[in-house]
Design a protein with these regions (language model features):
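N-terminal, polar/charged subdomain of small-to-medium soluble alpha/beta proteins
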Residues: 2-72
Length: 72
């Protein structure tokens, strides 16, 4: 059985925003980041909050910690 090489991974935080849900905001964060970051491995939701305007929820925000293989 072939053994996987050890690796180094970098972690970045991104925030996705949606008018509909936290899930959609998280998905937007990951999919947008995937456009510029290669080899994404893990996405961890670290915080969820809402933007409030005039007493009403105007947006759902999801903070996501993403890890990807570091290639110097």
């Amino acid at each position: 059985m072939a053994r996987k090489k050890d690796g180094v991974y970098k972690i970045v935080e991104v925030v996705g925003v949606s008018e509909k849900s936290w899930e959609e905001a998280g998905r937007a964060a990951v999919e947008t980041a995937a456009g510029t970051l290669r080899d994404l491995r893990v996405a961890e939701v670290t915080q969820m909050d809402m933007k409030v305007d005039n007493g009403k929820v105007s947006a759902f925000r999801t903070r996501v910690s993403l890890s990807f293989k570091y290639e110097p």
